[in-house]
Amino acid sequence: MLKQSKKSSKKLKKSVIDGLIIINSTFNNTIVTATDCYGKVIAWASGGTEGFKGAKKGTPFAAQSATEKLIKALLEQGTQRIHISVSGPGPGRETSIRSFQTSGLQIISIKDITSVPFNGCRPPKKRRI
């Protein structure tokens, strides 16, 4: 007879000393992702996962609360130093960076990776209020 081995449902958490933070900020939402130096995702959070819906996902407060949730997950993992990459023109950029500065994690670099077209596709019409 064959024995069936039980698989453990608990994942082993690996301590990550250096982390890469990617902040993708659009007008509708801000997504904050933490990866290790190889690009494997450790944790992520966004305005939508924090309970904000609709237009409130794009606010700086939603970005700040998502960032604070991610910081808590990073501190549990034992992360000490981080590199930050910021992408997009949204309002959550500055508040996310400010939250990381006050968190106690050592910021090694902040890089802006927003792509700018060399007269590519036509942008959408101007927003009407």
From Swiss-Prot:
One Pfam family matching this protein: Ribosomal_S11
Any one GO cellular component localisation term in the record: ribosome
Chief localization: plastid
BP GO annotations: translation
Organism domain of life: Eukaryota
Keyword terms: Chloroplast, Plastid, Ribonucleoprotein, Ribosomal protein, RNA-binding, rRNA-binding
Gene Ontology terms for molecular function: rRNA binding; structural constituent of ribosome
InterPro entries linked: Ribosomal_uS11, Ribosomal_uS11_bac-type, Ribosomal_uS11_CS, Ribosomal_uS11_sf
Keyword rRNA-binding on entry: yes
Keyword Calcium recorded: no
Localization (cell): Plastid, Chloroplast
Protein family membership: Belongs to the universal ribosomal protein uS11 family.
Subunit structure: Part of the 30S ribosomal subunit.
Xref: NCBIfam families: PRK05309.1, uS11_bact
Protein name (database record): Small ribosomal subunit protein uS11c
Source species: Cyanidium caldarium
